[in-house]
Each structure stands twice: as structure tokens, then as C-alpha cells.
Amino acid sequence: MFEYLIKFSPKILFIVEGTLITLKYSVIAVIFGLVIGVLLALCKVNKNRALRLFADFYTSIFRGTPLLIQLSIIYFASPYLIGIKFTVFMAGAISFSLNSGAYVSEVIRAGINAVDKGQFEAAEALAIPKFLIMKDIILPQAIKNIFPSLTNELINLIKESAIISMFGEMDLMKRAQIVSLETYNYFFPMIVAACCYYILVMLISFIARIIEKKLIVS
């Protein structure tokens, strides 16, 4: 077994290097997904019916269709629809961000609705602008309440990003597939990739628990 690991050590390093690509997609998607999610959530709790309908329609589209189809449309159809040919990385980052935004919006909406409405009414009575009420009072409490759900979204993004390998991106999954074809050994490369995903998820979960404890104390 030890000799086997030494023999395949260059291949193992080749697979592990894909972790950076996987992490890059996930971080970009969770950042932009959070921004999109906040904007959509604000639309969903807005009194303007048109904004609510738009946000609900957006969410239904991205929650109601597979991520693979969304990625395929953005990558293959964008030259015909908008005249722009996205790279695999750009298409992946855009599709993951848009998809994540739909799910995050529902999480944030629930967090906003969970905040005591009396706080909003009290702030309004003090003539505080609605924008500041939402930014300084409601959203900070909502984010604190939904932080575990946001962590789960990041973990899901890390695992779901594996579909980008189908478009030729050299992420963890693609590198494991390449090594499998080169060595005629499918099991070992996939175990290495699985270990990398597992370590990433456990590391993020550990960091998230530390942050969550600090949020609870604050």
C-alpha cells in the first residue's frame, strides 16, 4: 500500500491542486449569491407587488430547473441570445451565483420575517429611514439567525461545483477523471477527490462553528 502511494504521489498532487479551482468557484458563488439573495429577499418583503412577483418568479426559475441545465444554457446559448461567448469559468461562476442567489433569498426572507416586527415599528416611530432600519437593525439580526443555513449553502456549492468538470474545467472531479483514464484505476483517484471534498467541508464547518459562537455571544 505504501509503495502504491509513493508511485501515485504525483497523481495525488495533481488531483489535490484542483481543490483551489473548486474553492474559487464556491467562494465567488457564495459572495455574489449572498448579494443577489439579499436584494431578492428585500424585494420579497417589499410592499411593491411588482418587485415581489419578480423575486418570486426569479426564485421559481432557478429552484425549479436543474443547475446543469442552467449552466448549459449560459455556456452554450449565450452567444446566440446576447452575443457573448463566456469562458467555462465565467459561465460556471455566473450560473452558480444566480442559482445560489435564489436559494439564499428564501433563507434571508425567512430570517427577516423571524425578526420581531415590533423593532421595525419602534424604529419607524422614531422616524428612522426604512433603508437604515433594514441595514442597521433587521438584516444584522436576520443574518445572525440564518448563518448556519448560509454555511450549508456554501457546503452545497462546493459539492455541486463538480458538474463544471463536464465542461472541461480542471477542478477536483475533472482531475480525478483524467488520472482514472491515465492509470486505468477509477477507484483510487475518486477516493482522493472524495477526501479533498470531505476535508474542505469539515474545515468550513469548523470555521463556521467558531464564527457562529461569536455571533451568539455578540
UniProtKB/Swiss-Prot annotation:
Chain's role: Part of the binding-protein-dependent transport system for glutamine; probably responsible for the translocation of the substrate across the membrane.
Organism from which the protein derives: Rickettsia bellii (strain RML369-C)
PANTHER family according to UniProt: GLUTAMINE TRANSPORT SYSTEM PERMEASE PROTEIN GLNP, MEMBRANE COMPONENT OF AMINO ACID ABC TRANSPORTER
Compartment list: Cell inner membrane
GO cellular component: ATP-binding cassette (ABC) transporter complex
Transmembrane region(s): 25-45, 57-79, 86-108, 187-207
Protein name as it appears in the record: Putative glutamine transport system permease protein GlnP
Pfam families associated with the record: BPD_transp_1
Swiss-Prot/TrEMBL keywords: Amino-acid transport, Cell inner membrane, Cell membrane, Membrane, Transmembrane, Transmembrane helix, Transport
Annotated ranges, domain ABC transmembrane type-1: 19-208
PROSITE patterns: ABC_TM1
